[in-house]
Amino acid sequence: MGLLVSRVLRCRDSSLLEPQPEAIAGASYIPGSRKRKRNSLEELATSSNVHGPQNQGMYPHQVLNYIYWKRVKISSNDAYQNLFLDGHDSDIKIRALGRTWCLHKVFLCQSGYFANILKGTWRESHHGVINLIIKNEDIDTRSLHFVFGALYTDADLSITPLEVPQVLAAACLLRVDRVIQQCEGIMKETINRNTVCSYYLAAETYRLKAVKTRCFEWLLCNLMVHPSVALYKEVDLKLMYLLALSSDLLVMQKEIDVYTTLKIWMFLYLNPCWNGTMKQLLQHANNWLSTHMAYVDNISFLESEEGLIFQPVFKKLRFQHIICDLTSTTILEQDRLIPMAWLSPIYKQQWLTLLRTQEYGVIGPQVINEQELEECTMRCGTMIPKDGRYTWKWSVGRLGFPLRVTFTRQCVILRQRCQRCDGSACHNHIRNVIFRITLVCFDSNKRVTFRKTTGYKILTFEYKEEQIVMKLDSDVLTFPMCIFCNFLFVNLGNAENK
């Protein structure tokens, strides 16, 4: 109990440690009698058991003085059991949420909240009882009990990950830094699909910046790579808005798949009682949307009363990378989810950009604009199931040029494909592209075990040219592995849709 005693002694204050008059029994206390107090403490020194029957009338400050003067260590288990759980020698009661705790001022003063309450004129107007009115619904009796108990022991008390947000809320209310730090450590180590959203909300509420950042990074990596019905049900509107906005979102396949993810998330948001598998989810979402829109004329779903709250999230889709192929455009039109007022300016913008590219021989972006990269790059990705050589292309429409990606255990290669795109912007033999390649490996718990990125770079390609854009150490690679790319072929913003 050495650390516990030192913590309590450091926060001792005469206004906290003096027994309250209403708690004193008659003649056993004589104000100002130092001789009597000194004699009683000398009598205590003859006993080796501070919790023995002869000492049941001791006040907590006497217990601490005894420990301090005699250099006797009492285990924190004894303090936790005898003083906290059994309530021996309690000099104050805390009432909250329908429960009463018999506690001790010398331990409560470790809480910044109670240290302030117990000062000044409090003891003049109360009778050894503090009534807490708690309006925070995250705090319950279990979390309060945990935080009170932590004041009586040096050891970290056991807590499950799912209980952490409630304990953190109680610790922040009572201002117990040690418990806040314990919660922060547990949260950092136990982020998974069952905890990530509750941790994120708690970290945002109670300003744990490092935890909030880790949770957001976990979601960026796993939202589309490891989709889950349970996870999607937990993501709220604000959080999904931030995820859809980010260029760091690890997108599986293409931008149309971000749209699909938002569609099934919206379905679950509006139908929280739906139970099924990820394989069933898209079909159910499509059927639900089709049935709903059968009774709606002239407007899209996002323009309906139910859909209005989702508009900010869907506006962050990069439609210029969705309408670049017929299949994706057909999906948008059939769903009638997106307002035509959003899409018409994008069609116009794409067409004018294509004409300018062909007319003036634009070779592509020549400077890196951070804001444009964050808002406008094409996001795409795929899974590498096992070791080997893989080659594929992502459709980039007529504003890009035919780019082929090759992955081997030694490197990643980008190449301008051999065939020309008649009538497209790729008639120029020399073209620029801004790109970023990111490789990620996960363990069985969906945690990132390996990550490597090129950062954003500009490459100039001549016709049929190939370039190695990332070299790899084959010894550190594990499979399956995910490869993600961000591309910007022209300086094309989403200005009409912001």
UniProtKB/Swiss-Prot annotation:
One of its GO terms (cellular component) is nuclear matrix. InterPro entries: BTB/POZ_dom, Gcl-like, SKP1/BTB/POZ_sf. The gene is Gmcl2. SMART domains: BTB. It is found in: Nucleus matrix. The keyword Nucleus applies. It holds the Pfam family BTB. Its main location: nucleus. PROSITE patterns: BTB (PS50097). It comes from Mus musculus. Pathway: Protein modification; protein ubiquitination. Residues 90-160 form the BTB domain. Interacts with CUL3. It comes from the Eukaryota. This is Germ cell-less protein-like 2. A motif (Nuclear localization signal) lies at residues 33-39. Keywords: Developmental protein, Differentiation, Nucleus, Spermatogenesis, Ubl conjugation pathway. Possible function in spermatogenesis. Probable substrate-specific adapter of an E3 ubiquitin-protein ligase complex which mediates the ubiquitination and subsequent proteasomal degradation of target proteins. One of its GO terms (biological process) is spermatogenesis. SUPFAM superfamilies: POZ domain.
